[in-house]
From Swiss-Prot:
Family affiliation: Belongs to the UvrB family.
GO terms, molecular function: ATP binding; ATP hydrolysis activity; DNA binding; excinuclease ABC activity; helicase activity
The protein's name in its UniProt record: UvrABC system protein B
Keywords per UniProt: ATP-binding, Cytoplasm, DNA damage, DNA excision, DNA repair, Excision nuclease, Helicase, Hydrolase, Nucleotide-binding, SOS response
Subunit structure: Forms a heterotetramer with UvrA during the search for lesions. Interacts with UvrC in an incision complex.
Species the sequence originates in: Streptococcus equi subsp. zooepidemicus (strain H70)
Span of domain UVR: 627-662
Pfam families recorded: Helicase_C, ResIII, UVR, UvrB, UvrB_inter
Lineage: Bacteria, Bacillati, Bacillota, Bacilli, Lactobacillales
Sequence ranges assigned to domain Helicase C-terminal in this UniProt record: 435-601
Motif mapping: Beta-hairpin: 97-120
Domain Helicase ATP-binding: 31-271
PANTHER family membership: UVRABC SYSTEM PROTEIN B (PTHR24029:SF0)
Length: 663
């Protein structure tokens, strides 16, 4: 059994004190949590410092906290911010570890079976293991996750019970330790020392935990007793210090012991027999043969190796769950009284609701045609009501809370006033007739003042046509479409801020991360066309893009006033009035946010350049030169991973593997 460390409080490190609306919001949220309120909403306007408020709340209530974001990009940003706020506590990152994922599927109309194909990102896998091990070892944990946290993960009890606990002076033979490591899916490799592997040199065993990336452990034996445990650099073997206790968690989240494995296999065989009878009774002989062949192969692999590709499809039997019972997820690794914070809840809660149905439709086809046993349906994401059953206390965070959140609670804490004194922008409506000439005039005014412009359209064609028109008029403009990758997107935003171009056009510019203080004008074309991007929430989010500049202004081009437009304008005016009154009372003059232009791109490019240089010359290198190149590339890979640029980290990893294969 694992002993958690002594209770450790969260320690928030920041050069700022709460200001504006933050003190009252923090106090209200904390009082509600300590008073036992199950659900509440933090309605925070854009730029009011919601993440800082969330951090203050976490530090005051001292509960393990799960922060859920609706995509990897936003989760990465939040992870970076929380790491800065809590350098002495465990801040973890838990998102899907696939760089590429093609799920297993079957298309009956063309009799096409698509085998599961995926590429696992080693860095993210390491971070996932770090998250689960931290949750089992300590209490001061913040996990920033995407909706991947509601997918099946394996039993936390089996994961914890399988952990190998080691101390100096403990009586255990070297061979007993080796057997224990193999049982928890560690792989012996005396040459290529990586995460989830161990190597043996006489009476010394070196183990590389699945949750680490640079540090491993050296266990030295004296007879059948552990003499010493040392922490070492995995690459150089340099000793970093002695350890008085080491807990090695399994190298995979799906793990079970021998006794449970035999019980699981018996259940799989019983289910297989039942399903074969059903297929044969229906005359589905091809499906029966297919299912028998695939399942018996998997059973043999489970018996011999304790693991098989697609083991998650048998997780119901491995975990000892009943049919239809929800799978274990990351949420089960938390203690009962943990806190959940849902960032951009109007988006995230919709994702949580939609995950289950899409997954079931695909898997049902595999079951019907004999590719999987019916129990595979229980390897799934949680339904929304199952997610709700895990909730002890929850805070929904959004500038525009959705209907679902509003139905869950009447407790709404507003955070309207910005620490900078910035006001919500003025909004005006202009007719669409002659909008191009009118817009061009407004853009030129901003260019003269050294400011930037966002334009949001409804269709790709209109965005492309408008881009061409503005280019012909001599405007430096770019169009950001959905095919652009994360790194390119970051580069475009950076170039806009630096003034490489002055106008950015897009269909959905209300997405997270598009916060550019230099933008003083947001133009919304076809504002009267009701729909997802032109409903009240969409309009408020888009209006918020101009709230980082003291001269922020929004123009809606429309031929009529829709209910959504009116509500968005009224809400913006309400917030603006509150902000103006606060500024007047406290003598605050709004100042445009001074935000550093983070040079993520140049750092990534420097790493990329080193990788390219090594790739160009490695064939002519000597063996020792290649070893040096590998060391440098591994450092570059870590650098890219710390910047959360996992695509680049994966490319560097592949190059390292190529170099190693040459020796």
């Amino acid at each position: 059994m694992i002993d958690k460390r002594d209770f450790k409080a969260f320690k928030l490190v920041s050069k700022y004190d709460p200001s504006g609306d933050q003190p009252q919001a923090i106090e209200a949220l904390v009082d509600n949590i300590e008073g036992g309120e199950k659900a509440q909403i933090l309605l925070g306007a854009t730029g009011t410092g919601k993440t800082y408020t969330m951090s203050q709340v976490i530090s005051k209530v001292n509960k393990p906290t799960l922060v859920i974001a609706h995509n990897k990009t936003l989760a990465g940003q939040l992870y970076g911010e929380f790491k800065e706020f809590f350098p002495e506590n465990a801040v973890e990152y838990f998102v899907s570890y696939y760089d590429y994922y093609q799920p297993e599927a079957y298309v009956p109309s063309s009799d096409t079976y698509i085998e599961k194909d995926s590429s696992v990102n080693d860095e993210i896998d390491k971070l996932r293991h770090s998250a689960t091990s931290s949750l089992l070892e300590r209490n001061d944990v913040i996990v920033v996750a995407s909706v991947s946290c509601i997918y099946g993960l394996g039993s936390p009890k089996e994961y914890a019970d399988s952990a190998v606990s080691l101390r100096p002076g403990q009586e255990i033979s070297r061979d007993q330790l080796l057997n224990a490591l193999v049982d928890i899916q560690f792989e012996r490799n005396d040459i290529d020392f990586q995460r989830g592997r161990f190597r043996v040199r006489g009476d010394v065993v070196e183990v590389f935990p699945a949750s680490r990336d640079e540090h491993a452990f050296r266990i030295e034996f004296f007879g059948d007793e552990i003499d010493r445990i040392r922490e070492i650099e995995s690459l150089t073997g340099k000793v970093l210090g002695d350890a008085d206790h080491l807990v090695l968690f399994p190298a995979t989240h799906f793990v079970t012991n021998d006794e449970h494995m035999e019980q699981s296999i018996s259940k799989i065989q019983a289910e297989l027999a039942d399903q074969l009878k059903l297929f044969e009774a229906e005359g589905k002989l091809l499906e029966a043969q297919r299912l028998r062949q695939r399942t018996e192969y998997d059973i043999e692999m489970l018996r011999e190796m304790g693991y098989t590709n697609g083991v998650e499809n048998y997780s119901r039997h491995m975990d000892g769950r009943s049919a239809g019972e929800p799978p274990y997820t990351l949420l089960d690794f938390f203690p009962e009284d943990f806190l959940i914070m849902i960032d951009e809840s109007h988006m995230t809660m919709g994702q949580i609701k939609g995950m289950y149905n899409g997954d079931k439709a695909r898997k049902q086809m595999l079951v019907d045609y004999g590719f999987r046993l019916p129990s595979a349906l229980d390897n799934r994401p949680l339904r929304r009501e199952e997610f709700e059953s895990h909730v002890h206390q929850i805070v929904y965070v959004s500038a525009t809370p959705g209907d679902y959140e509003m139905e869950q609670t009447d407790t709404i804490v507003e955070q309207i006033i910005r620490p900078t004194g910035l006001l919500d922008p003025e909004v005006e409506v202009r007719p669409s007739m002659g909008q191009m000439d009118d817009l061009l005039g407004e853009i030129n005014l901003r260019i003269e003042r050294g400011e930037r412009t966002f334009i949001t359209t409804l269709t790709k064609k209109m965005a492309e046509d408008l881009t061409d028109y503005l280019k012909e008029m001599g405007v430096k403009v770019k169009y950001m479409h959905s095919d652009i990758k994360t790194l390119e997107r970051t580069e475009i935003i950076r170039d806009l801020r630096l003034g490489v171009f002055d106008v950015l056009i897009g269909i959905n510019l209300l997405r997270e991360g598009i916060d550019v203080p230099e933008v003083s004008l947001v133009a919304i074309l076809d504002a009267d066309k009701e729909g997802f991007l032109r409903n009240e929430r969409g309009l408020i989010q888009t209006i918020g893009r101009a709230a980082r500049n003291a001269d922020g202004h929004v123009i809606m081009y429309a031929d009529r006033m829709t209910d959504s437009m009116q509500r968005a304008i009224d809400e913006t005016a309400r917030r603006r009035a509150i902000q103006m009154a606060y500024n007047e009372e406290h003598g605050i003059i709004p100042q445009t946010i001074k935000k550093d232009i983070r040079d993520l791109i140049s750092i990534s490019r420097a790493v990329e350049a080193k990788a390219t240089e090594a790739e160009t010359n490695y064939e002519s290198m000597t063996r020792s030169e290649r070893q040096e190149a590998i060391k440098q590339l591994q450092k570059n890979m870590q650098e890219a991973a710390e910047l959360l640029d996992f695509e680049l980290a994966a490319q560097l990893r592949d190059l390292i593997l190529e170099l190693k294969a040459m020796d």
